Design a protein with these regions (language model features):
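Helix-to-coil/beta transition segments that act as allosteric "coupling" elements at the rims
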Residues: 121, 127-146, 152-200
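Intrinsically disordered, low-complexity terminal regulatory regions
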Residues: 1-157, 209-242
Length: 242
């Protein structure tokens, strides 16, 4: 466990090692892998009193609409009724969630973020946080909506491995200010992830009660890169149990 206000180089090195080992016991599904990740960060990052430093930790991954399980497909269709007509539609899918509120600990309880269809760049740009998350972690929105295998390992991708909102209050990237940021005392937001060999995009997002300094955020670039390395072999696992 790590006290977030005291997270330094030593803690980063230890966290990096633990992240690389998080999937040693092979997860059967992407959801199981995501559950390990959100639990690791929610339970492992603490404030100065020993309580969870994060109000909420979530993990997302893009998935082809045609490859979604029936329940997830139904959720996508409610959000985008003509989803079946969009060629090779990608959906940002909530793999796992852990947080302070009981309803934040079950994917099925998520109303707005369980499955988010991403039909066009214009529609993605209307969701500021998703657009910024993709831009910071995936390089270009077009790379996520229409993956090009020739670009997946572009060296530029290595620089887009951190999404950082130092002050959540008033941030244009977090639209739900009163209902979420103010109500649950969100101070900073940190995200890491990127593009996988499958062409899919993934991200772990931490909504912290305590301010995260730029120095601490920089250390999580290494943590995020190691999470990506650990997650790479799992990219083609089934989303959920059949």
């Amino acid at each position: 466990m790590y006290t977030l206000t005291q997270f330094g180089f030593r803690e980063m090195m230890d966290c990096r090692t633990r992240i690389r080992a998080i999937f040693n016991d092979d997860p059967a599904t992407l959801a199981e892998a995501g559950e390990r990740v959100v639990k690791f960060f929610y339970e492992g990052l603490l404030d100065d009193t020993g309580k969870p430093a994060c109000a909420l930790v979530r993990m997302f991954k893009t998935h082809r609409f045609s490859d979604l399980d029936p329940q997830s497909r139904a959720v996508a269709l409610r959000a985008l009724p003509d989803a079946e007509t969009v060629p090779d539609l990608r959906c940002l899918t909530l793999l796992a969630t852990a947080g302070d509120q009981p309803e934040w600990n079950q994917v099925a309880n998520s109303r707005a973020h369980r499955v988010i269809p991403l039909p066009t760049e214009a529609m993605v740009e209307r969701a500021p946080m998703i657009a910024q998350l993709i831009t910071q972690l995936g390089g270009k929105i077009s790379n996520v909506l229409r993956p090009d295998p020739n670009l997946l390992f572009d060296t530029k991708d290595a620089t887009y491995n951190l999404f950082y909102v130092p002050r959540a209050v008033g941030s244009p990237f977090i639209v739900s200010q009163k209902e979420f940021v103010e109500a649950y005392r969100i101070a900073s937001v940190l995200g890491f992830g990127g593009l996988l060999a499958s062409g899919d995009f993934f991200a772990a997002i931490l909504f912290s009660h305590i301010p995260i300094t730029s120095q601490v955020a920089d250390l999580f670039k290494v943590v995020g890169m190691n999470l990506k390395v650990a997650f790479l072999p799992l990219a083609r696992r089934p989303l959920f149990k059949a």
